[in-house]
Amino acid sequence: MFDTVIEMLSYPFMTRAFLVGSLVALCSALLGVSLVLKRYSMIGDGLSHVGFGAMAIAAAMNAAPLTIAIPVVIVAAILLLLISGNAKIKGDAAIALISTTSLAVGVMVISLTTGMNTDVYNYMFGSILAMSAEDVKLSLVLSVFVLILFIVFYHKIFAITFDETFARATGVKAGVYNTLIAVLTAVTIVLGMRMMGALLISSLIIFPALTSMRVCRTFKSVIINAAVISVVCLIAGVTLSYVAATPAGASVVLANLVMMVLYTVVGAVKNHMR
């Protein structure tokens, strides 16, 4: 086992996968708790489809994928908030509207230009080989930026997560912080797409939060446990991907599923013993 770990870390692409993956998993878990509690967890799925469309366009233009995808997905996240604020269009409908349109654009661009090549396949399903050195540098900077902003505005995010109406009454600018959460989520989604894939990246937002809630009862404990679960499952999934030659995204999701089953059993036992 130890020899396998040494062998994995001897490859630069594995070191990049563990480093960036852990940071993205950490950011996803922190944001995921608020998104799940606000019943807005599927925003990750919607934005990942937007990211796929943006990366397809970047591939057709031979441009750097992250530099194209990040601003496009941020705009889409803000647009989602504006549309969902319209009483005539609910949040889930807004997500479906934007995500399906973006996916259609991506598929059309691919069919008219490059076709289903390896890069596009990696964007959809993820690959531990997909992270370049430039991607790592940008991902490190942006991940640290996301973490710092979340920590700095933790109390405001806590307030709008549990009672947005009361938060507004106490002077908290809920719209600003909702936008902040959406923008941070957009950046995190794009950073994780290269490894997890557009079809599976939303699992990093949903699984750790729901798993932690099986056992934990306070906001802080849920966040801490979700962060630990997310990073542990990411490392386990990437390791499985290397050993078994399976897609990284699928391996991480399965690791999260196993962890959720374990936490559900532990939670049921704790409730039974009370």
Predicted stretch roles:
Residues 2-16, 87, 95-155:
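Transmembrane helix-bundle core of multi-pass membrane transporters
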Residues 4-9, 124, 128-129, 229-266:
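C-terminal binding/interaction regions
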Residues 17-20, 66-73, 92-96, 140, ...:
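Loop-to-transmembrane alpha-helix initiation sites
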Residues 22, 26-30, 71-79, 105, ...:
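Generic alpha-helical transmembrane segments of integral inner-membrane proteins
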Residues 33-116, 212-224, 241-244, 267-269:
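Short loop segments and helix-boundary regions at transmembrane helix junctions
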Residues 136-208:
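Helix-loop-helix "hairpin" substructures at the membrane interface of multi-pass membrane proteins
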Residues 155-156, 265-274:
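Membrane-interface capping segments at transmembrane-helix boundaries
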Residues 201-250:
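Transmembrane alpha-helical segments in multi-pass inner-membrane proteins
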